[in-house]
Amino acid sequence: MSVTKNTIPYNQYYQKRTHIHVYPVEFVVRTLLGNYPNLAMNQDSYFGSKLLDLGYGDGRNMPLFHNIGFKIFGLEISQEINRLACERLEALGIDAELKVGQNNCIPYQDQFFDFIVACHSCYYVNEGSSFNENLIEISRVLSTEGVFIASLPMRDNFIFNDAELLSDGHYRITKDPYGIRKGTIHKTFKDKDEIIEIFDPYYKDLSIGYINDNYYGINVKMWIIKATRK
């Protein structure tokens, strides 16, 4: 969610998505409400907890967060995206505090949030920065014992077709069938061991799953994680 130079394409993309009703991403629903052998979630802790929806896009997960009792905060790359989301949320009767920021610049004090959800967002990296800088900033604003839920792309996810390798698993996107991500930098993750190594300085109780779907020619391959802040 660090794509400053692509702000205009993102604004235009979300300006076209002005319908009131939006629907949550499946892995977010499953992580928060499911029951799985390799996932421990205290669902009794949700009500009243402060949750940051990092790079929330059209706000599709916010009705879910509202329904299960979270206090909702959202971060996006432009005030225009925030404005569009505010209109939708007001129509749905949902309260949320929305701010402009980046993955490596989150305008909140240390340990402010109890939960952070980064649905297809935290791996966007600013020019001259790195995913580790994103993770340090995300960890700064998450409370001790707070929960981080995120998706992380595999190398053979569709968006990396013909992408330019930079360094340390970072790629510059050269093609995007949706026309909004060309030129942005994303971090990929090759396996579970790499994820564990990167997250271990800041997190414990790491649960890792994955998504491998083909939506009629769009191959979506993502790691999904839940981690507890040390």
Predicted regions and their residues:
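Conserved class I S-adenosyl-L-methionine
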Residues: 1-47, 149-172
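A short acidic, Gly/Pro-enriched loop at the edge of an enzyme's catalytic core
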Residues: 104-116
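Conserved S-adenosyl-L-methionine
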Residues: 204-214
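A short, conserved alpha-helix within the catalytic core of class I
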Residues: 126-137
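Helix-to-beta-strand junctions that scaffold the AdoMet/dcAdoMet cofactor pocket
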Residues: 126, 142-143
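Class I SAM-dependent methyltransferase SAM/SAH-binding core
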Residues: 52, 59-105
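Short alpha-helix
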Residues: 185-202
